[in-house]
Amino acid sequence: YVHTFRRPVKFEGTTYKTLTFYWDRLTGADMISIENEMQDMNEYALSPEMSASFLAKMAAKAAGVGSDFIEALPVPDFTKIRNEARSFLVSTGY
């Protein structure tokens, strides 16, 4: 999935017009890593497909960026990416 930002996004000195998400490259280890990261922050996702935090972290892994980048996006871009992450997760039977 290639997300085209509504407006270019600047983050840590880099300007992004698009961001590519490689959902099919995610592994079980990535999912466990996300859960562990959330637990370290005292966050828990009882239903990962409904957790904005879980989905943002999953999207970040799929795009090869930090979750802080995804979380810093404007709401319209964040929401679109979160929904794409949810669609992917549900399509896998998670």
Q: Residue locations for each model-derived region?
A:
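Short, surface-exposed, charged amphipathic helix/loop patches that serve as local interaction elements
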Residues: Y1-Y94
